C-alpha cells in the first residue's frame, strides 16, 4: 500500500481540501516530544490535525479512563461509579464493569501511542488504525465504501464507549484479531466539545484498511452520478466562497412569474410541488428530472442563489 496513492485517491473522491485521516500506532520510540494532556487525551488532536505528530504515554495522558482504554494502566477503581453515577452513561456501575470485562482491553506492550496525519508518516507498516473526522456527506461516502465488499450486519459498528474507547480500543482489538468491522464514534458527550459540531469519528482497523485500500476506486466514490452530486456539494462547502442570505429573496420560477420575498426553505418546498407536474414543466425547467426530494431542490437553489440573487 502506497500512502501517496491513497491520498491522491482520497482527495479525488472527497475533494482536494478534504481533511486527511489520522494514523495511530504504538512503538517504544518517541516520535515527538509531547506535553502532558490535561483531561481528555483528544485535546491534543488539534495539533495532529494541523500536521504535528503526537506521542502519548502513561506519563502524558492524565485522564484515568484515557490511560486505561489505551492499555497503559488497569481500570481505576472509580471508573465504574464515575461513568454511571456521575456521567450517567450507564444505569449502574455493575453494567460498566460488565462492559469492560466483555471488552477485554489489551495491555499496551510499547511505551508510546502515536497519532499523525497520514501525509506525515512514511508508510502504513506499524499502523493499527486510520481515524477519519468526517462531516455527514463525507461519512456517507466512507460508510458506502465500507459496505461495497462486505455484507456483514456489523461492517459498520457503533458500540458504546468513551471517545478513546470507540476510536482506539475497539480498533486495536479488531485489528489484532484481523477483523473486518469499522467503527463510528464520538457519540460520547464528553469528547464532543473538542471537535466541530458536524463531525463524528470513523475508524478503520488496518486489518480492514488493507482490503478497502484496493476497493476505493471500484466503489461508488468514482464515476457514479449519485456520488458526483454529493462530491459537488462537499467541494462547494470546502471552498468557503459561498454566502447564502437568510433574509427573504425574490427570483423567477417560470418565465414572467416571480416568487416574491420568500425564505429559501419555502422556495424549495414550492419547487418540490412542481414534481407532480414534471411532464408539463419539462420544457421550462429541464433540471427537474434530476430532483427527487425537497433536499435536492433546496441544494440546487442554494447553489444557484449563491451565484446570482435577484
Predicted regions and their residues:
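Acidic, serine/proline-rich low-complexity intrinsically disordered regions
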Residues: 2-246
Amino acid at each position: 500500500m502506497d500512502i501517496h496513492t491513497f491520498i491522491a485517491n482520497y482527495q479525488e473522491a472527497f475533494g482536494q481540501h478534504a481533511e486527511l485521516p489520522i494514523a495511530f500506532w504504538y512503538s517504544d520510540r518517541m516520535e515527538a516530544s509531547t506535553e502532558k494532556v490535561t483531561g481528555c487525551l483528544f485535546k491534543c488532536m488539534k495539533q495532529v490535525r494541523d500536521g504535528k505528530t503526537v506521542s502519548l504515554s502513561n506519563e502524558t495522558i492524565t485522564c484515568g479512563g484515557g490511560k486505561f482504554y489505551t492499555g497503559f494502566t488497569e481500570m481505576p477503581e472509580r471508573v465504574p461509579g464515575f461513568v454511571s453515577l456521575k456521567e450517567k452513561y450507564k444505569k449502574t456501575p455493575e453494567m460498566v464493569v460488565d462492559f469492560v470485562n466483555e471488552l477485554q482491553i489489551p495491555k499496551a506492550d510499547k511505551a508510546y501511542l502515536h497519532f499523525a496525519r497520514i501525509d506525515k508518516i512514511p508508510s502504513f507498516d506499524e499502523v493499527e488504525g486510520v481515524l477519519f473526522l468526517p462531516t455527514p456527506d463525507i461519512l456517507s461516502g466512507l460508510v458506502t465504501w465500507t459496505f461495497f465488499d462486505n455484507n456483514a450486519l456489523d461492517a459498520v459498528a457503533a458500540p458504546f464507549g468513551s471517545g478513546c474507547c470507540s476510536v482506539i480500543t475497539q480498533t486495536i482489538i479488531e485489528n489484532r484479531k484481523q477483523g473486518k468491522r469499522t467503527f463510528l464514534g464520538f457519540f460520547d458527550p464528553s469528547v464532543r466539545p473538542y471537535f466541530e459540531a458536524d463531525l463524528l469519528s470513523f475508524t478503520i482497523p488496518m486489518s480492514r484498511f488493507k482490503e478497502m485500500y484496493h476497493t476505493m476506486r471500484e466503489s461508488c466514490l468514482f464515476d457514479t452520478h449519485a456520488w458526483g452530486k454529493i462530491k459537488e456539494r462537499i467541494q462547494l462547502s470546502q471552498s468557503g466562497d459561498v454566502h447564502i442570505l437568510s433574509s427573504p429573496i425574490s427570483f423567477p420560477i417560470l418565465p414572467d412569474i416571480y416568487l416574491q420575498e420568500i425564505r429559501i426553505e419555502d422556495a424549495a418546498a414550492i419547487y418540490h410541488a412542481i414534481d407532480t407536474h414534471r411532464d408539463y414543466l419539462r420544457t421550462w425547467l429541464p433540471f427537474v428530472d434530476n430532483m427527487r426530494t425537497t433536499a435536492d431542490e433546496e441544494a440546487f437553489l442554494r447553489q444557484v442563489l449563491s451565484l446570482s440573487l435577484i
